[in-house]
């Protein structure tokens, strides 16, 4: 199985890579901004390859990114878009560049990755986009997460649309809207907050869903939370 984990240098993405890499039949490309963290991953797992990329400027580096992917894979079976950034500020206090960075990283970057990778996918392939309960319609909302939630709502809606656009190609697209998970990103945004689920636990669920979920589900936004957010 050829798998790309977009955003795997730390947190949930890293745990997904480590879990999937336990199966030697899985060959994984992991992308991220932190080159040192990526190198540590590839050094510890023989079936993991790394591609350093800044999603906020991927539109300017798309050809370079595609060449790096093609150096390892001619076919992609699974794409998991986990990359994300969170700036916890209320709507009237957030700076324009902070808001744009979240939208570039959480929406436009993953969308660009899909556009680059999709031609390498065949019938039976699966794209899994990771969203948030903050971007899940009808869920409880929280102060300081307006732009973050909007960016996650965007990737969720895109998932529904792409499932229809890619249907004739046999490529499934689903979205997991995660509740709070204990990660570095959460701790940095909300010091002292304790989530009910840790990164390793949710990584096992994401990995299983990425490999098997498309056999039963397509074009769905699935809430994965024991509480809100």
Regions found by a protein language model. Name each.
Residues 9-10:
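Conserved glycine-rich cofactor-binding loop
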Residues 24-40:
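Conserved glycine-rich Rossmann-like NAD(P)H-binding loop of the short-chain dehydrogenase/reductase
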Residues 45-59:
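Rossmann-fold cofactor-recognition segment
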Residues 82-87:
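Conserved NAD(P)H cofactor-binding loop of Rossmann-fold oxidoreductase domains
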Residues 90-91, 98-100:
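Substrate-binding pocket helix/loop in short-chain dehydrogenase/reductase
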Residues 128-154, 159-160, 164-167:
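Catalytic loop of short-chain dehydrogenase/reductase
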Residues 168, 175-176, 191-229:
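C-terminal helical subdomain
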